[in-house]
């Protein structure tokens, strides 16, 4: 009721009054048949399966209570959580722990546009649609909220000290140590969900520089080692919480060769340190440094080190920017350089003796002993030790999103799978099938830019990725979801630059384009665009869209990123079928038959006129021809007749001449 709470009328028509006060705004029954009742001013009522009524009110001292006593709507998601729209925020109630998680409007693009929620509706895909008081409509799907975000904060306990994240490592207690650019080192206490910052403080025992590029955890010695940019090497004694700094000294050959440290990796009881000026072997006990390879021609080319790795055979691999990869054996003092050589062809197995690019970002050895190299511009290389050859995987051959790979790790969840970060996001590589699956902002990946080396997998399988907008984490298992079904719709038709609407002056559409199976266009309407859309609003559920115009071309074309208009121009008259589909067989393709009429001079009645006119002309010409033939024959006959008469006259004349001659001769004789 509006002011008297809730009344209950049972099967026996007995009326009771279980909730006696409150302006009731909403009654919702969840999948467990439990009731959730929203009220204005008296919070949320929950009637459980036993019929017990629980009144949940806002408690300013409890951050896990409902955010407001003014509740407008309730809805259950597909995970069994109850979402409550209130005057001051959206609340998620988890039955398992009885706590409320509150979401309010913020400056971030992924936050609510307004905190006052009026209504909540769940669609067939499980997406929740929120009507706000002054922020329009918001939507999201809780099933696909698999990423946890960590952002820079002004408060140490609540977030990162810097939004630019680098290398990470886990300690024995499961805490994550994070290198940042400009914010020192952050420690994330995963169990508590809190942070601690280790930043440079002038005049105090602290890290020497806030731009930290390398990290190594010595569990046995209970020490953390940090490599900084311009601050040299730092040791943190975890027992005393004190820092020791190691810097380059011009007059000391046993000091660091540079204060710019790029990577640190252990070797027996020593540390191999990669710097901006080569590689050195650092002894933590004597605190002295021995620079490697400085006396060899090959070694002098090693300057800017991108990554270091010691494989299971104790071979040191060095990624040197612009110089390819080096392998070094300490026992034999043998240094080998692997460089790119474009003149060396690939064999039948796509193997070559040349690495694909001289700029290698990271090196990794998987559980099978395979060595992998990520490059800046040529994708991923696999080193085959038995043949001393490389196999390359890239965008063109294998579907990688970008050929610039920053870091590689082996999956802890899926066998024979690699995880990679690129300058386009995050990718999984199925090694047996030689195929990549890519994640980017288009399919729900939350980071627009991933940083170098900022990929780490914890012992319990949680994946952490860092970028220039903070850090995210997720579990690989969450990436393998059952795709949701949806529909493809044709939404708009534009002909010769003008949008066509039902029953307009063109007469092309009588109904909405989505409900129109075929259209007819005039001859001068052969330039048109068709807009498509889908009922899918889940980024992670997006599929590749393909289209084809049968009658024009049977080739399937893929839709480019951000494109939802498909245009055709100067089509010949005829009948075509426009088809839009996805690569998934369970999504029904949409079809539109298009008839383009010919111009009037190509219509059937025009051709009939042409035939009649041509036939009549032919008949006329035939008649004229026949008349001329008859006239010619008549003239010939007359001519022949005249000639015959002339011949007859001549014959008569000759006859009479001869007769007269015959008669005249005797008479002449008689007269004579």
Language-model features: where?
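Residue-level "micro-hotspots" composed of small/polar
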Residues: 19-25, 54, 58-71, 101-118, ...
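Conserved beta-propeller blade signature
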Residues: 35-36, 81-83, 127-130, 175-177, ...
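Short loop/turn segments that connect beta-strands within beta-propeller blades
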Residues: 10-13, 48-51, 94-98, 141-145, ...
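Residue-level detector of Asp-centered blade-edge/turn motifs that repeat once per structural unit
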Residues: 29-32, 76-79, 122-125, 170-173, ...
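Loop/turn residues immediately N-terminal
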Residues: 3-6, 41-44, 88-91, 133-137, ...
């Amino acid at each position: 009721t509006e002011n008297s709470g809730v009344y209950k009328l049972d099967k026996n028509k007995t009326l009771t009054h279980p909730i006696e006060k409150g302006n009731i705004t909403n009654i919702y029954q969840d999948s467990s048949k439990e009731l959730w009742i929203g009220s204005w001013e008296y919070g949320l009522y929950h009637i459980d399966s036993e019929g017990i009524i629980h009144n949940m009110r806002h408690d300013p001292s409890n951050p896990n209570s409902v955010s407001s006593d003014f509740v407008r709507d309730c809805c259950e998601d597909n995970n069994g959580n109850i979402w409550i729209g209130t005057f001051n925020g959206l609340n998620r109630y988890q039955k398992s722990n009885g706590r409320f998680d509150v979401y309010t409007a913020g400056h971030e693009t992924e936050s609510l546009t307004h905190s006052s929620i009026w209504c909540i509706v769940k669609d067939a895909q499980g997406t929740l649609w929120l009507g706000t008081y002054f922020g329009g409509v918001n939507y999201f799907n809780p099933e696909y909220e698999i990423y946890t975000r960590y952002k820079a904060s002004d408060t140490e306990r609540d977030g990162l000290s810097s939004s630019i994240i680098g290398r990470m490592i886990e300690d024995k207690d499961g805490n994550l140590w994070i290198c940042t650019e400009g914010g020192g080192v952050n420690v994330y206490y995963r169990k508590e969900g809190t942070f601690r910052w280790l930043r440079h403080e002038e005049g105090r025992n602290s890290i020497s520089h806030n731009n930290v590029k390398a990290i190594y955890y010595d569990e046995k010695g209970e020490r953390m080692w940090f490599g900084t940019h311009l601050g040299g090497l730092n040791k943190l004694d975890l027992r005393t919480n004190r820092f020791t700094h190691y810097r380059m000294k011009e007059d000391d050959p046993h000091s660091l060769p540079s204060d710019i440290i790029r990577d640190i990796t252990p070797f027996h009881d020593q540390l191999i340190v990669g710097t901006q000026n080569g590689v050195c072997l650092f002894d933590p006990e004597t605190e002295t440094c021995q620079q490697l390879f400085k006396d060899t021609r090959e070694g002098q080319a090693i300057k800017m080190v991108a990554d270091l790795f010691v494989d299971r055979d104790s071979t040191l691999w060095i990624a040197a920017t612009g110089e390819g990869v080096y392998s070094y054996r300490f026992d034999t003092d043998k240094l080998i350089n692997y460089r790119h050589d474009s003149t060396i062809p690939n064999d039948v197995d796509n193997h070559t003796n040349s690495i694909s690019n001289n700029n290698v970002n990271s090196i990794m050895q998987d559980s099978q002993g395979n060595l992998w190299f990520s490059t800046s511009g040529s994708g991923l290389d696999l080193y085959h030790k038995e043949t001393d050859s490389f196999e390359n995987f890239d965008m063109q051959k294998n579907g990688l999103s970008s050929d610039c790979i920053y870091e590689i790790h082996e999956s802890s969840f899926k066998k024979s799978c690699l995880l990679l970060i690129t300058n386009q996001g995050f990718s999984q590589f199925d090694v047996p099938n030689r195929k990549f699956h890519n994640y980017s902002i288009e399919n729900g990946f939350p980071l627009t830019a991933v940083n170098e080396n900022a990929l780490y997998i914890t012992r319990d399988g949680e994946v952490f990725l860092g970028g220039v907008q903070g850090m995210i984490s997720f579990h690989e298992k969450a990436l393998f979801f059952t795709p949701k079904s949806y529909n493809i719709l044709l939404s708009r038709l534009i002909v010769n630059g003008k949008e066509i609407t039902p029953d307009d002056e063109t007469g092309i559409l009588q109904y909405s384009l989505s409900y129109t199976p075929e259209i007819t266009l005039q001859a001068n309407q052969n330039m048109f665009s068709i807009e498509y859309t889908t009922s899918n609003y889940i980024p992670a559920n997006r599929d590749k869209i393909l289209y084809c115009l049968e009658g024009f071309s049977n080739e399937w074309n893929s839709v480019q990123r951000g494109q939802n208009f498909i245009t055709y121009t100067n089509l010949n008259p005829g009948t075509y079928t426009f088809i839009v589909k996805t690569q998934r067989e369970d999504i029904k393709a949409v079809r539109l038959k298009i008839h383009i009429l010919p111009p009037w001079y190509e219509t059937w009645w025009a051709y009939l006129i042409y035939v009649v006119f041509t036939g009549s002309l032919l008949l006329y010409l035939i008649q004229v021809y026949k008349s001329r033939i008859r006239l010619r024959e008549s003239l010939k006959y007359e001519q022949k007749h005249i000639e015959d008469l002339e011949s007859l006259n001549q014959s008569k004349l000759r006859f009479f001449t001869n007769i007269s001659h015959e008669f005249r001769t005797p008479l002449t004789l008689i007269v004579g």
